[in-house]
A protein has these predicted regions:
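Conserved coupling/switch loops of ABC nucleotide-binding domains, chiefly the family-specific signature
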Residues: 58-61, 207
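Helix-to-loop junction immediately C-terminal to a conserved catalytic motif
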Residues: 52
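ABC ATPase nucleotide-binding domains
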Residues: 76-80, 84, 88-227
C-alpha cells in the first residue's frame, strides 16, 4: 500500500481558554486537493497556519513523505501559500511579483514565464498590479506561490474577494491549473459550493474538531451527524423512529431509509428527497421561494418543517398538501 504524501497526527492548539484545534488527524495522497470547510471559528485557518509553520503546535506532528517536518520553520518546509488578500506588491510589476521569491539566476525569467502560462497570464509580465482585475490578481498570487516549486500548496479563502459571477469561472480555472501541475493542495473555505467544486476530499470542522472527512458525494449523501447534514447543503432535520430495517417513521407515516440503527433517530431530509403527493405526510405550505425553473417550499408538518424543491409547475398547488419520500433518507444515531 502506498504511503500517504501528507500525514497529520493529533494536531492541537489552544489560545488561552479557547481550544482552537483538538486532536486533528488525516492523511492526503500526492496530488490530491483537500478543502477544510466549516463556519467561522471552526479552526480552519489555525489548522492551515500550523501546517504552514506559522503557528506552533501544542501537540501532534506533521509528516511529508514520511519525514517529520514539525520542527521546521515555514521556509524549510518548502510549502507555498496564497493568502486571502493575495499580499501582492502594488508598486511591482507582475513579473517582479512572481519572481520575488526566486533566486536571481539564469532560469528566473523562464520560470516566471512558465508559471504565468500555467495560470493563463502569458504576456502580462510588464503589467502593474493596478491594471489587473480581481481574478487576474488572484492568478498572479497563485503564480508567485507556485514559482519556487513548493511541495505543498495552501490556499486561504482564495476566491472570497471575487464577485459571484467571476467566482464560479475562476473555480474551474483554478482546479484545472492545479490538477495540471499535480501539486498537493489544501484550501480553507466557509462555502460548501466552493469546497465541493475544488476539493477531491472535504474535511468538515466544528469547534476545532473534525466532524467528517470524505468526498463531496459521501458528505452530502451519507453525513455522519446532524451538523454535517445541515451545514453541507440544505437539509431538514426531523425526529423519527426506526420501525423496521430500512423503514423510518416520520410523523404518522413510514419512509424508506438507509442504515441499520434502531429506536429514535434524527432523520435528515434534503429538499430533493421528498415530493408532493396525493397521500403521505400531511402538511401546510408556509413559504414559497422562486429559483428560476424550480421553487423552494417550506412545508409545516406534525413532525416539523420540511424544505422541498419542486418544479415551477407545483407553484400553484393549494396550501394543504401531502408529501412523501422519493428515495431513501439519511439519519444519524443521536437520540431525540
Amino acid at each position: 500500500m502506498t504511503a500517504p504524501f501528507l500525514q497529520v497526527e493529533g494536531l492541537s492548539k489552544r489560545f488561552g481558554d479557547h481550544q482552537a484545534v483538538a486532536d486533528l488527524s488525516f492523511t492526503l495522497a500526492r496530488g490530491a486537493m483537500l478543502a477544510l470547510l466549516g463556519p467561522s471559528g471552526s479552526g480552519k485557518t489555525t489548522t492551515l497556519r500550523m501546517l504552514a509553520g506559522f503557528e506552533q503546535l501544542d501537540a501532534g506532528r506533521i509528516l511529508v513523505e514520511g519525514r517529520d517536518v514539525t520542527p521546521l520553520g515555514p521556509a524549510a518546509r518548502r510549502f507555498g501559500m496564497v493568502f486571502q488578500h493575495y499580499a501582492l506588491f502594488p508598486h511591482l510589476s507582475v513579473f517582479e511579483n512572481v519572481a520575488f521569491g526566486l533566486s536571481k539566476d539564469a532560469d528566473r525569467a523562464s520560470r516566471v514565464a512558465e508559471v504565468l502560462r500555467l495560470v493563463d497570464l502569458a504576456g502580462f509580465e510588464s503589467r502593474s498590479i493596478g491594471q489587473l482585475s480581481g481574478g487576474q490578481q488572484q492568478r498572479v498570487a497563485l503564480a508567485r506561490a507556485l514559482a519556487p516549486e513548493p511541495r505543498l500548496l495552501f490556499l486561504d479563502e482564495p476566491l472570497s474577494n471575487l464577485d459571484p459571477s467571476l467566482r464560479e469561472r475562476t473555480r474551474a480555472e483554478l482546479r484545472a491549473a492545479l490538477k495540471q501541475i499535480g501539486i498537493t493542495t489544501i484550501l480553507v473555505t466557509h462555502e460548501q459550493e466552493e469546497a465541493f467544486a475544488l476539493g477531491d476530499l472535504v474535511a468538515v470542522l466544528k469547534d476545532g474538531r473534525l466532524q467528517q472527512l470524505g468526498t463531496p458525494t459521501e458528505l452530502y449523501e451519507h453525513p455522519q451527524n446532524q451538523f454535517v447534514a445541515t451545514f453541507v447543503g440544505r437539509a431538514s432535520a426531523l425526529p423519527g423512529t426506526i420501525t423496521a430495517p430500512g423503514r423510518v417513521r416520520v410523523g404518522d407515516v413510514d419512509w424508506p431509509t438507509a442504515g441499520s440503527a434502531t429506536g429514535a433517530v434524527t432523520t435528515v431530509v434534503r429538499p430533493e428527497d421528498v415530493v408532493f403527493t396525493d397521500s403521505g405526510l400531511p402538511g401546510t405550505v408556509v413559504e414559497r421561494r422562486y429559483l428560476g425553473g424550480r421553487a423552494l417550499f417550506r412545508v409545516s408538518t406534525a413532525a416539523g418543517t420540511l424544505e422541498i424543491e419542486a418544479p415551477m409547475a407545483s407553484a400553484e398547488l393549494e396550501a394543504k398538501v401531502h408529501v412523501t419520500a422519493r428515495r431513501s433518507l439519511s439519519f444519524n444515531r443521536d437520540s431525540v
